[in-house]
């Protein structure tokens, strides 16, 4: 990663173009760091034949790539394709940046400040709201994240195999038959739901699923990260 991209999050709200640039730099380094770490976890899991760990990292890689793609193509591109932006459009762009970087569904301020009672009361309020079919947002959430399934579905409309890949890895990490297969093995006596009896079922699933994962993540992630980097206004740089 180019060191020029490594910028502390210290937005200058008086200059919206520089504010946008600061957000983009932080997003690029965050995406790069997460993708690199997930790949490391995936490779380490395969090395020690922990195929459930492989599937967990794989699903996160798909979700990360899908979210990046969604923001680049469906949020930034319609605005940045314009020759000039109005004041209102510039404000919208910065709001997109903020949601992209700081969106979430967990009250990190309460957690990091050790206000666990607030987390508890928010959880209780959320449960009560769900019973009455209402919605409750925790007090400390700055802006809500985009739903990752929205990102997956937007992509899958153009590339249906993405939904196949995502459904596969979701099934491999949920507590059901998919994840049970990853710790299963078989020999001449039959199928065992333990990893130590003959041929590993998880290894077979890994070999069969890896091409799906590679097609859905490596090149798409690199392409869309480059597009995100290109969203920086160079003429505003010192």
Regions found by a protein language model. Name each.
Residues 1-238:
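A cross-kingdom marker of C-terminal helix-rich interaction/assembly modules
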């Amino acid at each position: 990663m180019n060191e020029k991209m490594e910028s502390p999050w210290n937005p200058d709200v008086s200059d919206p173009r520089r504010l946008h640039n600061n957000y983009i730099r932080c997003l690029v380094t965050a995406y790069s760091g997460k993708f690199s770490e997930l790949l490391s976890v995936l490779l380490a899991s395969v090395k020690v034949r922990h195929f459930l760990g492989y599937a967990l990292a794989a699903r996160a890689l798909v979700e990360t790539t899908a979210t990046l793609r969604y923001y680049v193509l469906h949020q930034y591109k319609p605005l940045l394709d314009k020759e000039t932006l109005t004041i209102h459009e510039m404000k919208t762009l910065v709001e997109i940046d903020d949601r992209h970087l700081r969106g979430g569904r967990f009250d990190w301020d309460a957690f990091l400040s050790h206000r666990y009672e607030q987390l508890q009361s928010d959880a209780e309020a959320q449960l009560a709201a769900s019973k009455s079919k209402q919605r409750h947002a925790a007090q400390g959430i700055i802006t809500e994240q985009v739903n990752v399934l929205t990102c997956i579905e937007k992509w899958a409309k153009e590339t249906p195999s993405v939904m196949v890949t995502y459904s596969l890895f979701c099934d491999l990490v949920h507590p059901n038959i998919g994840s049970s297969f990853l710790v299963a093995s078989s020999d001449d006596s039959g199928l065992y739901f333990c990893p130590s009896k003959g041929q590993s079922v998880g290894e077979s699933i890994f070999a069969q699923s890896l091409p799906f994962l590679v097609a859905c993540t490596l090149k798409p992630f690199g392409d869309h990260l480059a597009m995100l980097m290109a969203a920086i206004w160079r003429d505003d740089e010192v």
